[in-house]
Design a protein with these regions (language model features):
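Acidic catalytic/metal-coordinating carboxylates
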Residues: 38-39, 65-68
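Two-component/phosphorelay signaling modules centered on CheY-like receiver
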Residues: 17-35
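Alpha4 helix (beta4-alpha4-beta5 surface) of REC/receiver domains from two-component response regulators
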Residues: 68, 90-107, 111, 115-118
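The feature encodes the CheY-like receiver
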Residues: 20, 62, 91
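Non-catalytic signal-transmission and effector/linker regions of two-component phosphorelay proteins
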Residues: 1-11, 114-135
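Acidic, metal-coordinating helix/loop segments flanking the phosphotransfer/catalytic sites
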Residues: 36-54
Length: 135
């Protein structure tokens, strides 16, 4: 198995270019394989073609909000792909939105570096559980 086959594949969707660059550098440094996308449009196709393990979705993105993108993209994604809402907004609001939209997790944008990597790995490992215990 090659090194890239062992990496957790993450698709990061955010309209903030600086945020995308920061996340890409950070997650690459922690051994993730990262792909970025600057728009809520086209995410379903990316998910279908790139088959990421995790999709980190900015909630406040123009055109379609993160929870709406999640609803559309989940239909194109393999059952093992996990969707995580990502936002700088109040954590209780983010938690509520994640629960109501069926996200597999949520992460505040204040979580960075090693803490972010640990949270993503934790959500990824939960995706390995049988579907019946995932909810």
């Amino acid at each position: 198995m090659s090194e890239s086959e062992n990496k957790i594949r993450v698709l990061v969707v955010d309209d903030d270019v600086d945020q995308l660059m920061l996340l890409e550098r950070t997650l690459n440094a922690y051994g993730f394989e990262v792909r970025t996308h600057r728009s809520s449009l086209g995410v379903s196709n990316l998910v279908r073609n790139a088959i990421p393990d995790l999709v980190l979705l900015d909630v406040n993105i123009p055109a379609l909000s993160g929870d709406k993108v999640l609803a559309l993209a989940r239909n194109q994604a393999p059952a093992t792909t996990r969707f995580i809402l990502y936002s700088a907004s109040d954590e209780s609001k983010l938690r509520s939105l994640a629960l109501s939209s069926g996200a597999d997790g949520y992460i505040s944008k204040s979580v960075q570096g090693e803490a972010l990597a640990r949270k993503l790995i934790s959500i990824y490992k939960k995706s390995k559980l049988p579907a019946a215990s995932a909810r």
